[in-house]
Amino acid sequence: ACTGSLVLLSGCTDSSPLPPMAEGEEVVVVTRNTPTTYYFESDRASGFEYELIRAFAREYNMLVRIKVAFSLPELFEMLASGEAHLAAAGLSQSAGRDAQFVASNPYLYQQPLVVYKSGALRPRSLDALAGRDIVVLAGSVHVETLSALQQDIPELAWREIHAADSLELMHLVTDETADLAIVDSIEFSIQQQLLPRVVAAMEIGDSTPN
């Protein structure tokens, strides 16, 4: 199964520091600095989701102001407090997020993966995750996935890492300070070029809409 990418809308409240989003005005977008969302190349802002936001802004004659969050919890806090109108950051859909934010239609799907260091013990089943040192991004839907699995595998445990993207998780696996990491397939396919010894062991959970 797979997940998809979404744009989340904050729905500014009366106490929000921002005026409501309106045609011809400024739209404030919170994102992450990752190769799949927003980054600088030769002093020029780029990234798939950044280009989507620019296209949206052009359609409604808006100016774009970007804010960068350094972890998913920070991103969601900025959105919930009204510091941004939108979040565009390679976000996946989940029941928890749907209860708090309004999401766009998904525009791509990606599969969560368990990854490990080549040459280390490869897990081949969900039960084999028990007793392993697993890392996930704090605030990610993978935390929800693992929490659900823990109902059937009580020995399952993990560490939540506050980082912008999965590259830090993969570094922990490469450095052997973690056994396994849960990452999304699209980020993994890009980041693996930097860390080729980190390889996919198996899929976990359903693919999610972004």
Q: What is the meaning of each model-derived region?
A:
Residues 27-30, 115, 132-137, 181:
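Short, well-ordered beta-strand segments
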Residues 8-11:
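C-terminal motif of bacterial Sec signal peptides marking the signal peptidase cleavage site
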Residues 136-150:
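Secondary-structure junction motif
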Residues 73, 77-80, 88-100, 145-149, ...:
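A ligand-binding cleft/hinge motif common to bilobed small-molecule-binding domains
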Residues 105, 116-134:
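Flexible hinge/capping segments at coil-to-helix
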Residues 14-91, 95-99, 158-163, 171:
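Extracytoplasmic small-molecule ligand-binding "clamshell" domains
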